[in-house]
From Swiss-Prot:
Pathway: One-carbon metabolism; tetrahydrofolate interconversion; Amino-acid biosynthesis; glycine biosynthesis; glycine from L-serine: step 1/1. The gene is glyA. It comes from Streptococcus pyogenes serotype M4 (strain MGAS10750). The lineage of its organism: Bacteria, Bacillati, Bacillota, Bacilli, Lactobacillales. It catalyses: (6R)-5,10-methylene-5,6,7,8-tetrahydrofolate + glycine + H2O = (6S)-5,6,7,8-tetrahydrofolate + L-serine. Its cofactor is pyridoxal 5'-phosphate. One of its GO terms (biological process) is tetrahydrofolate interconversion. It is an enzyme of class 2 (transferase). This is Serine hydroxymethyltransferase. Belongs to the SHMT family. It is found in: Cytoplasm.
Length: 420
């Protein structure tokens, strides 16, 4: 009998699936990736995630598993835990959360009860679905009240947030964002939380790599719980991470993840997280993170100097920025689709005090982590900004759009994603 194990590779065994995978590899290779939540992992991360660890079930935690034969995965998970603790200066780490959303769900479960009041950043102001959107579990389970940004500066107004916290008396305050381009003052957030007797949870999913490298202030000394993804600026596999310095909360977090929300952990993904944490502990990672910030600032500055576009909040301190494109094209959705046609990938995004529907939006969101992983610098970042402007301003001129496609191809050829 021919065993399934004899099917040595995807290309030979499942050509239809392989073609789709290969097409995605080609798309990544020849498109400029500017989606702020995406990055490009190393081959070592991919190798760990594709290892035999995918075969092993390991419910519970190292040294206390429900199944036998876990001595090897215990080593793997412990490596990931210890590296995460060292990387972020935290006393405790849970690396089992399958995603950032599940990490947030576990944090909520550890800190509050269903129906409790939570103060979180409004989605339209730059927050995340899990920070209280009514269509998300967070908004359905807890009583979320949204805080926004200042109408004039489009930045967080900590005095206003304090007054709002006094008014609603939340059990928990959530800081962190998915589309906020400015540095967040976590010390001020902790002071607000302490003033009203609330817990502080920080979702640092977008900025985790910058925090790890020390180029963005860390929330770990101030938050009761910090959650994150392990991809985005951290450049690891898609997954979640939870940190705390409080032993009692660490126990609650572990119980919330397992058995509260999940069964067996994905040890192959945890191995890939361990690789990514080791990569981020290398001194060279700080140079990478600083390059992200430099590239993002350089790209944003090009838009700031063009009065046909409006840079939200006037600039950026991290890996991301938002641009109001409605002076040159009807909405962000059309901008996203047009740029897709010239092989530049980004996403439509609501801007503060948005007037269009979430399916259209006035803005686009741009992030520079992925192009920095390819080795692009300030010069290329400025070039990409000019190409975006060229395409959007001339969105009905196919000859010019073809010029942009060719210039994009020249850039991607000069900075190959995975050298053959």
């Amino acid at each position: 009998m021919t065993m399934i194990f004899d099917k040595g590779n995807v290309e030979d065994f499942d050509k239809e699936l392989w073609d789709a995978i290969h097409a995605e590899e080609e798309r990544q290779e020849h498109h400029i990736e500017l989606i702020a939540s995406e990055n490009m992992v190393s081959k070592a991360v991919m190798a760990a995630q594709g290892s035999v660890l995918t075969n092993k079930y390991a419910e519970s935690y190292p040294g206390n598993r429900y199944y036998g034969g876990t001595e090897c995965v215990d080593i793997v998970e412990t490596l990931a835990i210890e590296r995460a603790k060292k990387l972020f200066g935290a006393a405790f780490a849970n690396v089992q959360a399958h995603s950032g959303s599940q990490a947030n769900a576990a944090a909520y479960m550890a800190l509050i009860e269903a129906g409790d009041t939570v103060l979180g950043m409004d989605l339209a102001a730059g927050g995340h679905l899990t920070h209280g959107s009514p269509v998300n579990f967070s908004g359905k389970t807890y009583h979320f009240v949204g805080y926004s940004v200042d109408a004039d500066t489009e930045t967080l107004n900590y005095e206003a947030i304090l007054e709002q916290a006094k008014a609603v008396q939340p059990k928990l305050i959530v800081a962190g964002a998915s589309a906020y381009s400015r540095s967040i003052d976590f010390e001020k957030f902790r002071a607000i939380a302490d003033h009203v007797g609330a817990y502080l949870m920080v979702d640092m999913a977008h900025i985790a790599g910058l925090v790890a490298a020390g180029v963005h202030p860390s929330p770990v000394p101030y938050a009761h719980i910090v959650t994150s993804t392990t991809h985005k600026t951290l450049r690891g596999p898609r997954g979640g991470l939870i940190l705390t310095n409080d032993e009692a909360l660490a126990k609650k977090i572990n119980s919330a993840v397992f058995p509260g929300l999940q069964g067996g952990p994905l040890e192959h993904v945890i191995a890939a997280k361990a690789v990514a944490f080791k990569e981020a502990l290398d001194p060279a990672f700080k140079d990478y993170a600083q390059a992200i910030i430099d590239n993002t600032a350089a790209m944003a500055a090009v838009f700031a100097q063009d009065d046909r576009f409006r840079l939200i909040s006037g600039g950026t301190d991290n890996h991301v920025f938002l641009v109001d494109v409605t002076k040159v094209i009807a909405n962000g959705k059309l901008a996203q689709n047009l740029l897709d046609e010239v092989n530049i990938t980004l996403n439509k995004n609501a801007i503060p005090f948005e007037t269009l529907s979430p399916f259209k939006t006035s803005g686009i969101r741009i992030g520079c982590a992925a192009i920095t992983s390819r080795g692009m610098s300030v010069k290329e970042s400025q070039t990409i900004a000019r190409l975006i402007i060229k395409a959007l301003v001339n969105h009905d001129q196919e000859t010019i759009l073809e010029e942009v496609r060719q210039e994009v191809r020249q850039l991607t050829d000069a900075f190959p994603l995975y050298k053959k």
